[in-house]
Design a protein with these regions (language model features):
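Short, hydrophobic alpha-helical packing/hinge segments within bilobed ligand-binding/sensory domains
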Residues: 65-67, 161-163, 180
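A late-sequence structural motif
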Residues: 40, 192-232
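Alpha-helical "hinge/linker" immediately C-terminal to small N-terminal DNA-binding modules
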Residues: 1-22
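Beta->alpha turn/N-cap motifs
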Residues: 62-63, 80-84, 104-105, 158, ...
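C-terminal regulatory
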Residues: 91-98, 102-170, 185-197, 226-232
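Immediate post-signal peptide segment of exported/extracytoplasmic ligand-binding proteins
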Residues: 18-28, 119-123
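Paired acidic/hydrophobic, glycine-rich loop segments that form the ligand-binding mouth/hinge
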Residues: 76-80, 171-175, 192
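Central regulatory/effector-binding core of bacterial HTH transcription factors
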Residues: 23-87
Length: 232
């Protein structure tokens, strides 16, 4: 991991020494959850990409597992739910991601005409990001006592697809409130269980020693995330 830090910091120093930061390509690797990438993360790097010739590589994983990329030295920063910093790293709390269980009016009429209950859930299709995504499973089990495998569940590795699955009446699912504010306001999507909102604290973990484009990138992520997550 230390070797990777040195190599990445070297490529940040070279453009400064040459005075040609606009033309030297700098590669920045970060680990992110799909929901952050689909909402606030891309705008966060816009100003940095305009200032530097930046090639960004995203390592996508569940927010519980992104920290492993930082631990292995594959990235200089990671968006994670872990509240404790790794050795040689520091962290900033960005805010809380709120997740709502939503469905379209048509889906509700078809599967939940008498409300959401165990009997209705047994036939209503849900959706998960991948086989390791257990947020929905834990949520339904905690509230209704229904275990994973006791109901149909689609799998799709795309946060944007979650929204489309819900809007087109294909599934009900947990989606970040930040991602569907317009759909909630218009009634295109309905919050099924307002009293059971999931709140997940999100942290930005990064190397302690950052300079140049990496420091600018880190600062942009912190500012954009804190602003977005405070306006849900």
């Amino acid at each position: 991991a230390h070797y990777q830090q040195v190599k990445l910091l070297e490529q940040d120093i070279i453009p400064d020494l040459s005075g040609d930061k606009k033309h030297e390509t700098i590669t920045a690797n970060i680990a992110s959850n799909a929901d952050s990438l689909a909402t606030w993360l891309i705008p966060a790097i816009g100003d940095v990409c305009h200032e530097y010739n930046l090639a960004v590589n995203f390592r996508l994983a569940d927010e519980n597992r992104t920290i492993n990329y930082l631990k292995d030295g594959e990235v200089f920063g990671a968006l994670s739910t872990h509240a404790q910093a790794l050795p040689g790293c520091t962290l900033e709390k960005l805010g809380d991601m709120q997740y709502l269980l939503v469905a379209s009016p048509g889906f509700i009429s078809r599967y939940f005409p008498q409300g959401i209950n165990v009997q209705a859930l047994a036939t209503a299709p849900a959706v998960a990001y991948d086989q390791k995504d257990d947020m929905h499973i834990k949520y339904i089990e905690r509230i209704f006592g229904l275990k994973g495998g006791a109901y149909p569940c689609h799998t799709v590795r795309s946060s944007e697809a979650f929204v489309n699955f819900a809007k087109h009446g294909i599934a009900y699912c947990l989606i970040p409130k930040l991602q569907i504010q317009a759909e909630l306001a218009s009634g295109e999507l309905i919050n099924l269980l307002p009293e059971h909102t999931i709140v997940r604290a999100l942290y930005w973990h990064h190397w302690v020693l950052l300079k140049g484009v990496f420091k600018a990138y880190s600062n942009a992520i912190i500012l954009r995330a804190q602003h977005a997550l405070s306006n849900q």
